[in-house]
Amino acid sequence: MKKPTSAPRSKAFGKQRRKTREELNQEARDRKRLKKHRGHAPGSRAAGGKPASGGGNQNQQKDPRIGSKTPIPLGVTEKVTQQHKPKSEKLMLSPQAELDLLETDERLDALLERLEAGETLNAEDQAWVDAKLDRIDELMQKLGLSYDDEEDEEEDEKQEDMMRLLRGGN
């Protein structure tokens, strides 16, 4: 009888054959040739990176940098565009004029009346009143004016001094 034939065994489990120098060089050339063709096509940066496919598609994809939708008049126009004027700084008033404005300020008068009536103002109004009163004091000092109350006190002191002198100098 015939002996059963065994299947041929693969040589994968055995010792692998070393590649020769020529085979290694050829594989390196193949890798280099494949590597050369990697990357973008030349001119892709200027073309927008999208390959043109189809003739009808070109009308839709126009370069947005070219042209403008707004019409530009080429002739001389009669209408002159008004230039925006920058806001001028506040006019500097003379100290006397500024003092007159502050003394006739309705808001300041109303808030001072509320204070005299015993009401308490919120912080914002109180700060505003204080600032305006300080400004009035500065302007009065610049102009050499003084409060009527101070003048009355000075007159009273002068009269008292006169009375002391008349009575005997004590």
Curated annotation (Swiss-Prot):
Stated role: A GTPase-activating protein (GAP) that modifies Der/EngA GTPase function. May play a role in ribosome biogenesis.
Keywords: GTPase activation, Ribosome biogenesis
Species this chain originates from: Salmonella arizonae (strain ATCC BAA-731 / CDC346-86 / RSK2980)
Bias-annotated ranges (Acidic residues): 147-159
Oligomer and partners: Interacts with Der.
Protein name: Der GTPase-activating protein YihI
Family that this chain belongs to: Belongs to the YihI family.
InterPro entries: YihI
GO biological process: ribosome biogenesis
GO molecular function: GTPase activator activity
Composition bias type Basic residues, residue spans: 31-40
Renumbered residue ranges of the record's region Disordered: 1-96, 145-170
Compositional bias (Basic and acidic residues): 20-30
